[in-house]
Amino acid sequence: MPTVFVTKKDSKLTPEDVLTKKIKLGIQRGTSEAVAIKKEQKAKKYPFELREYDSAPLAIEDLLNGRIDCAYMDELPADDSIAKGRAVKKIGTHGTPTDFGVAVRKSDTELLKIINEGYKKLMADPYWKELQKKYLNK
């Protein structure tokens, strides 16, 4: 899943501006993208001021209320905000996309087989498309 910059719909901010100007950037505390952007900011001396939030929707709220200039989050909550009619837009991606998976001990071969079969059945069912549309805006 890509990580995106989100601004107000009428903002002129660009991804380059985010990395080169002294703006307020909102991130969700404790996420992999928060860890990555903090590390990158320190290494590359990005001038933005980070503001941390308990959730991506809270960052969107502060963005809309003018407390931050941009939010940085996974694409899913950004797409959800846009789908709900919030006055925000994605202005670009940054960083490495995040992949998700299920971890299983090597010795749990039977559990792995059950999980993989479950995924195959779910993705073959038309209900999978409904879930993607409902939760992933696809």
Task: Report residues per predicted region.
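Proline/Glycine/Serine-rich low-complexity intrinsically disordered segments
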Residues: M1-K138
